[in-house]
Regions:
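P-loop NTPase motor domains
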Residues: 1-217
Length: 218
């Protein structure tokens, strides 16, 4: 079973990897995410919910300004945080991304990860958005496998990463202060998740398909 605080830490790590954030932005975002879960009925310490629902980015967008306003930062810093964090979260509630992240008729985890599904990101041009989508998908896959894995049985599911160099590009994971190496952090996060699931022996196969393997990270 995945503890809700463990899930939140993974989610914040994904945002920190994919969005340029500096100073206390990750801490403010984490505080807002935790409050969103509490508003949805979650007991964070016990990892229990009396309603069995999860907050959406709409819920996060509602609490972010309040969390920033309650902080002890200067007015200029608060204004910067509202502009940076709220604008980015709002972009996940509009257009096609709103349909992906906030749809009420979304596929269940069982349908997404146990059935025959193709996730086509070929038309997502922005690297930050593509990294965020893949990061959340891999996080959901990892948590789903950790909760439903059957050890040492027959092969049950195959996950294929086509043109894997777009996700596992050979690059440095180092970053300088107050900047984010989007590709490096995303590669590191994805590789660690795949490695963890492989070690867990959950009867799943991960196949990397790429015409140029020399461009892949090790």
């Amino acid at each position: 079973e995945i503890h809700i605080l463990e899930h939140i830490d993974r989610l914040v790590e994904i945002f920190s990897a994919c969005w340029p954030m500096y100073a206390a932005m990750p801490a403010v975002l984490k505080d807002a995410i935790e409050r969103s879960y509490q508003n949805a009925g979650w007991d964070l310490r016990e990892s229990e919910s009396n309603r069995g629902i999860f907050p959406t980015f709409f819920d996060l967008l509602r609490v972010l300004p309040t969390v920033i306003e309650e902080s002890h930062y200067s007015n200029d810093t608060q204004s910067d945080y509202v502009g940076a964090l709220c604008t980015r979260v709002k972009s996940l509630t509009n257009g096609i991304y709103g349909s992906v992240f906030c749809a009420e008729d979304a596929l269940s985890d069982a349908e997404l990860f146990d059935e025959n599904v193709i996730v086509d990101l070929s038309r997502v041009s922005a690297m930050e958005t593509k990294s965020l989508l893949m990061g959340i998908l891999v996080m959901k896959l990892q948590e789903y496998r950790m909760c439903s894995g059957v050890m040492n049985g027959k092969l049950r599911h195959v996950t294929v990463l086509e043109e894997a160099h777009n996700l596992l590009r050979k690059t440095s994971a180092e970053q300088v202060q107050e900047s984010v190496n989007v590709q490096g952090k995303s590669v590191e996060m994805l590789a660690n998740a795949l490695s963890h699931m492989s070690r867990a022996a959950c009867n799943r196969l991960f196949h990397l398909a790429d015409p140029a393997f020399t461009g892949l990270t090790r």
